[in-house]
């Protein structure tokens, strides 16, 4: 690969402009891969696409050549036309010599619509002439060609093609305007016509020509252009930027248009852009690259966890089912004792005064009894040894039990007798 790059760089440094395109490389086994390769038996394996000049578009003034399986854009060898053919051709008055590129002939063609105006300032005794190629030059005035008419200010004497003399508006350059423009034609013309000055400076209406041919011969790198006023000039040629066509590259190649040429590259996910919500994939089982839709992001609404578990979304979008212990249902409120007129529903937990002890029944179980609440729903007390079990049974010395069938009542005679003696 490095040797081939040095050859291309060397060709450019020596003046030969070659735009090469390398479609292969050396693999790890030392074989050359050019969308096909030499196998170990020495045979050519052409499994890849055939690369020829039909799929490569070269810039202007370049043509495609295939050398050693590589396509190259080589500069055209421009053959200059035989301009000397018109040197020995003398055309009659009103005609000039033109070189026909297609027929390779020097032809005498008439001026269309009139000979160009010569604006070159010539020394005394010389006049400006236009040769057969439209080039302005100063030639010595002959004695019989002297225009001796006295013309008014702003006009000058001119000799017509028939030899007659007349005074026409002067277009002679001035010192402050060495290249003055011709006077503006102000004549109103009918549709399809335009105002022009003839060779004598007279205004007239001529029919518009939509397909004027620009026949000026320009130097290399320049081309003929027709201005808005109908005049012709040579301007620098701007190379057109090549464009990719359906057959510019092989089937599995991607066409990239640069400033002066097109390049065929193998598409990869690095140089492939996919639309939104799509991503690029490539591999051995895929022909080239492919854009496939992105996977839908999972949410906890789409996850079903087992019992006593709930879905939690962690950092990075990771979903997990974590244990969620069930909450113990709230105990039934104590009902009012039928033998006591005090309200037992008006109880509270006073953490500040009793340090987290259960303070129900307007101050029951305070610090004097050193009662505590443990995990087994047990109220331990040294003196009274009262406990609260899960069967909603209140066990103490009086064997008070809760009878749900009698309508939320305390049915115990001993408790009723001792209820008034309880120190709240």
From Swiss-Prot:
InterPro entries per UniProt: Fol_N (IPR003645)
Question: Signal peptide: which range, if any?
Answer: 1-23
Domain called Follistatin-like: residue spans = 52-74, 85-109, 117-139, 184-206, 215-234, 299-322
Q: From the record, give the cysteines joined by S-S bonds.
A: none
An example molecular function term from Gene Ontology annotations = DNA binding
Q: Which domain of life is it from?
A: Eukaryota
Q: Where is this region: Disordered?
A: 330-424
Keyword Ribonucleoprotein (UniProt) = no
Compositional bias (Acidic residues) at which positions? 335-357, 365-424
Q: Per UniProt, which keywords does this protein have?
A: Repeat, Signal, Sporulation
The entry's cellular-component GO terms read: glycoprotein complex; plasma membrane; spore wall
User: Is the keyword Disulfide bond in the record?
Assistant: no
Picking any one GO biological process from the record gives: sporulation resulting in formation of a cellular spore
Q: What is this protein called?
A: Spore coat protein SP60
Name the species this protein comes from: Dictyostelium discoideum (Social amoeba)
């Amino acid at each position: 690969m490095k040797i081939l790059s040095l050859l291309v760089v060397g060709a450019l440094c020596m003046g030969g402009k070659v735009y090469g395109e390398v479609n292969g490389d050396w693999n790890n086994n030392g074989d050359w891969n050019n969308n096909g390769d030499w196998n170990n038996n020495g045979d050519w394996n052409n499994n890849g696409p055939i690369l020829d000049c039909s799929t490569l578009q070269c810039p202007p003034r370049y043509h495609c050549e295939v050398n050693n399986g590589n396509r190259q854009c080589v500069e055209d060898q421009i053959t200059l036309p035989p301009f000397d053919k018109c040197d020995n051709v003398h055309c009659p008055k009103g005609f000039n010599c033109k070189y026909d590129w297609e027929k390779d002939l020097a032809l005498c063609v008439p001026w269309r619509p009139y000979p160009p105006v010569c604006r070159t300032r010539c020394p005394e005794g010389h006049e400006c002439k236009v040769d057969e190629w439209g080039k302005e030059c100063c030639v010595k005035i002959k004695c019989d060609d002297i225009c001796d008419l006295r013309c008014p200010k702003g006009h000058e004497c001119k000799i017509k093609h028939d030899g007659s003399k007349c005074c026409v508006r002067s277009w002679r350059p001035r010192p402050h305007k060495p290249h003055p423009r011709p006077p503006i034609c102000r004549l109103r013309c009918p549709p399809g016509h335009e105002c022009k000055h003839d060779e004598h400076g007279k205004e007239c209406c001529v029919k518009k020509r939509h397909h004027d041919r620009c026949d000026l011969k320009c130097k290399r790198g320049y081309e003929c252009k027709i201005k808005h006023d109908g005049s012709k000039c040579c301007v620098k040629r701007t190379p057109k930027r090549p464009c990719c066509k359906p057959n510019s590259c092989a089937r599995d190649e991607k066409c990239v248009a640069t400033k002066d040429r097109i390049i065929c590259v193998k598409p990869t996910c690095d140089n492939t852009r996919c639309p939104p919500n799509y991503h690029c994939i490539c591999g051995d089982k895929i022909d080239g690259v492919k854009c496939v839709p992105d996977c839908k992001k999972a949410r906890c609404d789409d996850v079903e966890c087992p019992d006593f578990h709930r879905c939690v979304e962690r950092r990075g979008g990771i979903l997990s089912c974590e244990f969620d212990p069930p909450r113990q249902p709230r105990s039934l409120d104590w009902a009012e004792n039928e033998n006591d007129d005090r309200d037992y529903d008006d109880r509270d937990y006073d953490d500040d005064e009793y340090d987290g002890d259960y303070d129900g029944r307007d101050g029951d179980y305070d610090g004097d009894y050193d009662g505590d609440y443990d995990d087994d729903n047990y109220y331990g007390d040294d003196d009274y040894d009262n406990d609260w079990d899960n069967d909603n049974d209140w066990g103490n010395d009086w064997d008070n039990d809760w009878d749900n069938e009698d309508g939320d009542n305390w049915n115990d005679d001993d408790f009723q007798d001792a209820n008034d003696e309880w120190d709240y």
